[in-house]
Swiss-Prot record:
A Pfam family recorded for this sequence: ATP-synt_8
Descriptive protein name: ATP synthase protein 8
Record lineage: Eukaryota, Metazoa, Ecdysozoa, Arthropoda, Hexapoda
Superkingdom to which the source organism belongs: Eukaryota
Keyword line: ATP synthesis, CF(0), Hydrogen ion transport, Ion transport, Membrane, Mitochondrion, Transmembrane, Transmembrane helix, Transport
Length: 53
């Protein structure tokens, strides 16, 4: 049914954005915890920016 196509695309876009945000939030918390444990071992007073890329 061609009339339903815009609704399907909107649902797909909304679903994709939700999954993307959930994975990013999970990745942030997992990576943040790991970096906190690593930074606890080498306590330095300088600012260290540790990025994933």
């Amino acid at each position: 049914m061609p009339q339903m196509m815009p609704i399907n695309w909107i649902f797909f876009l909304f679903f994709f954005i939700c999954i993307f945000l959930i994975f990013n939030i999970m990745n942030y918390f997992i990576y943040e915890k790991k970096m906190h444990l690593i930074n606890k071992f080498n306590q330095k007073k300088k600012l260290t920016f540790n990025w994933k890329w």
